[in-house]
Swiss-Prot record:
<protein>
    <recommendedName>
        <fullName>Photosystem II reaction center protein J</fullName>
    </recommendedName>
</protein>
<keyword id="KW-1133">Transmembrane helix</keyword>
<keyword id="KW-0602">Photosynthesis</keyword>
<keyword id="KW-0674">Reaction center</keyword>
<keyword id="KW-0604">Photosystem II</keyword>
<comment type="similarity">
    <text>Belongs to the PsbJ family.</text>
</comment>
<dbReference type="GO" id="GO:0015979">
    <property type="term" value="P:photosynthesis"/>
</dbReference>
<keyword id="KW-0793">Thylakoid</keyword>
<dbReference type="GO" id="GO:0031676">
    <property type="term" value="C:plasma membrane-derived thylakoid membrane"/>
</dbReference>
<dbReference type="GO" id="GO:0009539">
    <property type="term" value="C:photosystem II reaction center"/>
</dbReference>
<comment type="subunit">
    <text>PSII is composed of 1 copy each of membrane proteins PsbA, PsbB, PsbC, PsbD, PsbE, PsbF, PsbH, PsbI, PsbJ, PsbK, PsbL, PsbM, PsbT, PsbX, PsbY, PsbZ, Psb30/Ycf12, peripheral proteins PsbO, CyanoQ (PsbQ), PsbU, PsbV and a large number of cofactors. It forms dimeric complexes.</text>
</comment>
<keyword id="KW-0812">Transmembrane</keyword>
<feature type="transmembrane region" description="Helical">
    <location>
        <begin position="7"/>
        <end position="27"/>
    </location>
</feature>
<keyword id="KW-0472">Membrane</keyword>
<dbReference type="InterPro" id="IPR002682">
    <property type="entry name" value="PSII_PsbJ"/>
</dbReference>
<comment type="function">
    <text>One of the components of the core complex of photosystem II (PSII). PSII is a light-driven water:plastoquinone oxidoreductase that uses light energy to abstract electrons from H(2)O, generating O(2) and a proton gradient subsequently used for ATP formation. It consists of a core antenna complex that captures photons, and an electron transfer chain that converts photonic excitation into a charge separation.</text>
</comment>
<dbReference type="Pfam" id="PF01788">
    <property type="entry name" value="PsbJ"/>
</dbReference>
């Protein structure tokens, strides 16, 4: 992991960021959907 990999760091960061945003989005959507259906 000395920066000599074939995958650029910005590609890894972008994919990781999108994955985190997607997980957070699904989590918050599920929380709000569950909260709305329980009321």
């Amino acid at each position: 992991m000395s920066g000599s990999g074939r995958i650029p760091l910005w590609v890894v960061a972008t994919i990781a960021g999108l994955g985190i945003i997607t997980v957070l989005g699904i989590f918050f959507y599920g929380a709000y959907a569950g909260l709305g259906s329980s009321i």
